[in-house]
């Protein structure tokens, strides 16, 4: 299944706010209308919608998300929390959380087009897994820095999560540590996502 490229507002009306997909928000009251129409949601549908929320927010294909679930299942600790850590530490998501891109698809384009360096080397793989002490910088070229500066100026000022530091004037971000669960940028019940996949096997 390919990455979603359809109408974004349609997704947030059904699933709620997906800040990684779009900066738009559902209209006030739309959640209530959706709830009134779906009072008798099956447990399967509830799990499916949580899985879809995760997939669309981080901009993943079904195959990519399944791969992350399997990796998380083999790691120590809570599968759900490890899954969120894996997704949050992707390079495209780190750029988004730093405010260098307005959405994760936009961050992915920056990476794909070679505008981003990690520890002094160009990384053009959006799924690159960042680690503590990684330094993310914008390429020292005018078009790259102008592009990111425009995005920084356009992004709504938000408090950075504890695991990241941004040095705006140096066009530099620092990964301080692995993200805490409380700092995840999406309202999600990750246990339902794990349950969804465990029932598919």
UniProtKB/Swiss-Prot annotation:
Top-level taxonomic group: Eukaryota
A cellular-component GO term for this protein: chloroplast
Function text: One of the primary rRNA binding proteins, it binds directly to 16S rRNA where it nucleates assembly of the body of the 30S subunit. With S5 and S12 plays an important role in translational accuracy.
GO process terms (BP): ribosomal small subunit biogenesis; translation
Gene responsible for this protein: rps4
Subunit structure: Part of the 30S ribosomal subunit. Contacts protein S5. The interaction surface between S4 and S5 is involved in control of translational fidelity.
Subcellular location: Plastid, Chloroplast
Protein name as annotated: Small ribosomal subunit protein uS4c
Alphabetically ordered keywords of this record: Chloroplast, Plastid, Ribonucleoprotein, Ribosomal protein, RNA-binding, rRNA-binding
Signal sequence, start to end: none
Taxonomic lineage from the root: Eukaryota, Viridiplantae, Streptophyta, Embryophyta, Tracheophyta
One Pfam family matching this protein: Ribosomal_S4
Sequence ranges assigned to domain S4 RNA-binding in this UniProt record: 89-152
One GO MF term: rRNA binding
SUPFAM superfamilies (alphabetical): Alpha-L RNA-binding motif (SSF55174)
Similarity remark: Belongs to the universal ribosomal protein uS4 family.
